[in-house]
A protein has these predicted regions:
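Residues forming the flavin
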Residues: 2-384
């Protein structure tokens, strides 16, 4: 709450959508979903994270040990906080990042590691004796001396049961998974991991030389950071440049583009394992459709073009809801048309914080303050 104006500044909301804003979503659509049993709506193209933010949901989880409130911190696979459980029964799947979960009609998601609710968690009492709960405290605190007829290990076994109930995040299903899974083998000259500017350019260059190329990206849409960029590439807006290049790659029979595909392991002899989320963006897979597919990719060479992850500035309370990465906040504004709050303060030590503030202000977000730890900020950045 802003003490001066009385406005709620921490809760997100959907901006007035217009051309150039909300590039990833269908402005005229509506998708119904539930979070912790409450009904909400979003747009086609939303992630669960962007839809929750648009509906003003600020607390989405609780921390592992102290059960401190957690909000959405990022916009991609680096998200540490917004872990949810989806589906029910035998299809229950815990620890899914809300930032990667594509919204679909009828989605049912639940927060984790809280009781009875994420907004009122009884286990938050753990914050009171927090200093006594140092890392590994249970390995010494409950190891009492042996007594006749009562061994120390027996006392630990008793305490261990209680600790295990309090530990962990989501709970998995106990029944057999009813979904189907597939496997594919692929052989190529060049594997490109990541479809930003570097990845697309590498795929283009290799394909133009006659090489067989596989281009993988973990997101639903290729383009990486360019999809929310306001910069120009070859005289065109970055997202238009991406669309043009992907259209050209699609015409080349030697190029395979795999979206929703995470390259997660590298083995000997240039062999890579990738997991494609074939039907995780729908409520249930089709009758003969696999839910996920494992790709064993053998290549002659690989280009790792996965980009960079913004590092947060460390300060007391930076784990609280309402604190998030600046570039991620910009992504929510530009790609999903969602403001992270009624008013924003940008805390930065480099130029990208100023550029994020510029883009957010351009689309109607109130940027109250920019705090830069540097003594000298380039005039060109201030002017931007």
């Amino acid at each position: 709450m802003d003490e001066r104006t009385g406005r709620q500044i921490m809760s997100g909301f959907r901006l007035n959508l217009r051309e150039g804003l909300g590039r990833a979503i269908d402005h005229g659509s509506k998708i119904n979903f539930t979070f912790d049993g409450k009904n909400y709506s979003g747009r086609v193209g939303d992630t669960l994270a962007s839809a929750l933010m648009a509906n003003g949901v600020s607390i989405v989880a609780r921390s592992f040990k102290y059960h401190r409130p957690r909000g959405i911190f990022s916009a991609g696979s680096e998200e540490p906080n917004a872990l949810v459980t989806v589906h029910s029964g035998a299809r229950t799947e815990p620890n899914i990042r809300a930032t990667e979960l594509e919204l679909y009609e009828g989605l049912e998601a639940k927060s984790q590691n809280r009781w009875p609710s994420v907004n009122f968690d009884v286990m938050a009492v753990n914050q009171l004796p927090g200093k006594a709960f140092s890392a590994g405290f249970y390995y010494k605190t409950f190891m009492g001396p042996s007594r006749p007829g009562h061994k120390a290990t027996q006392f630990w076994w008793f305490c261990e049961q209680l600790i295990r109930r309090a530990a962990g995040l989501g709970k998995g299903a106990s029944q057999a998974d009813p979904d189907k899974y597939g496997r594919m083998n692929a052989f190529c000259d060049v594997l490109v991991v990541g479809s930003g500017a570097a990845g697309i350019s590498a795929a283009e260059r290799a394909a133009s030389a006659g090489a067989k190329v596989v281009l993988c990206d973990e997101s639903a849409a290729a383009g990486g950071a360019l999809l929310s960029s306001s910069e120009l590439l070859d005289g065109a807006p970055a997202h238009d440049w991406v669309a043009d290049r992907l259209a050209e790659l699609a015409k080349n029979k030697n190029v395979t583009v795999l979206t929703r595909t995470t390259v997660q392991s590298m083995f000997d002899d240039n062999t890579y394992l990738a997991i494609e989320r074939v039907a995780d963006h729908v409520k249930t897979p089709g009758k003969h459709q696999v839910r996920q597919r494992a790709w064993n990719i053998r290549c002659k060479s690989a280009v790792i073009a996965t980009g960079a992850i913004e590092r947060p500035i460390v300060f007391a309370g930076n784990d609280r809801p309402g604190v998030m990465l600046a570039d991620s906040a910009r992504r929510y504004v530009v790609e999903y048309g969602v403001s992270p709050g009624r008013a924003v303060c940008v805390f930065t030590n480099n130029d990208t914080g100023w550029l994020a503030a510029r883009d957010m202000a351009k689309y109607g977000v109130i940027v109250e303050t920019i705090v830069d730890v540097r003594k000298d900020v380039p005039d060109a950045i201030r002017a931007a």
